Amino acid sequence: MKYPVLYEKSETGWGAYAPDLPGLGIAAKTLEEAKELIREAIAFHVEGIREHGESIPAPFATTEYITI
């Protein structure tokens, strides 16, 4: 499955979260680290869902850039 991920820069580093997986987010010092950590977090989260016999949520969020 393909989940959209949002990356946000802060004064101290980067945050990332997947809107389709509530409560799942990471913090990192660099964007590269954030990309690696969110990928690992999503995989771990989905694995946990499977282990509990629950259905994996289908991606539903979409993204768009709007020019003003």
Q: What feature does the model see in each segment?
A:
Residues Y7-L21:
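Short aromatic-glycine-(Arg/Gly/Cys) micro-motifs in beta-strand/loop hairpins
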Residues P19-P22, P57-P59:
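Proline-rich low-complexity regions
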